[in-house]
């Protein structure tokens, strides 16, 4: 009986305003979690280094591991918000359409990186206020959102990754520059689709891990509120 009270009482006592505040605050925490997860995944180079072995990228591309790693590192540094120069691969030529696409990709990543810088302090204030007021429903909403959306995307990816990949590019990029020609933009040969799928999986795992933290905070505050 006591477990039911712990779980339900904070939600049952919510007013309409409280529900709105919980959902809005939960969305902010979720967006912060997504921005941080994307930024971490972008800079987590060991994932790519592992895929170099698992996906046999050297064999499929025809380039040595040293060349692949060097050019990949250049690409990651370019996508960092602190990098202000143009993209120049040490060993790969690049077409004008390829250059434009990478500029667009950098803008997309910048949204998440700047989003993380803005939302981290905002979320910290929100979390401290929720703990002070014992507003556990905020964490409940954040946890539910952080589970529901990644789970839905995960099902889509598991069902048809190629469709998800293509649809994402069509929505985000208003051109077909993302369709690389390996002869004019050989960098695409070291960036297999499977690597991006693994990146998506890591992002979702990080978000789901964050959702567990939200649920743990909700349960802890729910117990304190009952006492």
List each model region and its residues.
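Hydrophobic secretory-pathway targeting helix
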Residues: 2-48
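Juxtamembrane interface at the cytosolic side of transmembrane helices
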Residues: 12-23, 120-165, 213-227
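Hydrophobic alpha-helical transmembrane segments
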Residues: 28-31, 110-124, 202-211
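Alpha-helical transmembrane signal-anchor/signal-peptide segments
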Residues: 42-60
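Short, non-transmembrane cytosolic segments of multipass membrane proteins
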Residues: 61-82
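Individual transmembrane alpha-helix segments
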Residues: 80-118, 194-203
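Juxtamembrane non-transmembrane "cap" segments at the membrane-aqueous interface
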Residues: 159-182
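Terminal transmembrane helical module of multi-pass membrane proteins
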Residues: 177-227
């Amino acid at each position: 009986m006591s477990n039911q009270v712990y779980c339900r009482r904070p939600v049952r006592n919510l007013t309409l305003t409280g529900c709105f505040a919980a959902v809005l605050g939960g969305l902010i925490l979720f967006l912060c979690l997504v921005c941080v997860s994307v930024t971490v995944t972008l800079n987590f180079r060991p994932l790519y280094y592992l895929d170099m072995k698992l996906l046999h990228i050297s064999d499929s591309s025809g380039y040595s591991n040293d060349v692949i790693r060097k050019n990949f590192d250049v690409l990651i540094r370019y996508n960092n918000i602190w990098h202000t120069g143009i993209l120049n691969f040490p060993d790969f030529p690049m077409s004008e359409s390829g250059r434009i696409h990478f500029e667009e990709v950098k803008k997309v990543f910048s949204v998440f990186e700047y989003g993380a810088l803005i939302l981290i302090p905002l979320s910290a204030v929100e979390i401290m206020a929720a703990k002070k007021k014992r507003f556990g429903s905020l964490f409940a909403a954040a946890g539910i959102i952080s589970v529901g959306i990644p789970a839905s995307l995960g099902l889509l990816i598991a069902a048809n990754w190629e469709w998800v990949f293509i649809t994402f590019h069509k929505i985000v990029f208003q051109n077909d520059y993302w369709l690389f020609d390996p002869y004019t933009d050989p960098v695409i040969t070291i960036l297999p689709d499977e690597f991006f799928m693994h990146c998506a999986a890591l992002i979702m795992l990080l978000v789901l891990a964050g959702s567990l933290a939200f649920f743990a905070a909700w349960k802890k505050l729910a117990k304190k509120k009952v006492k």
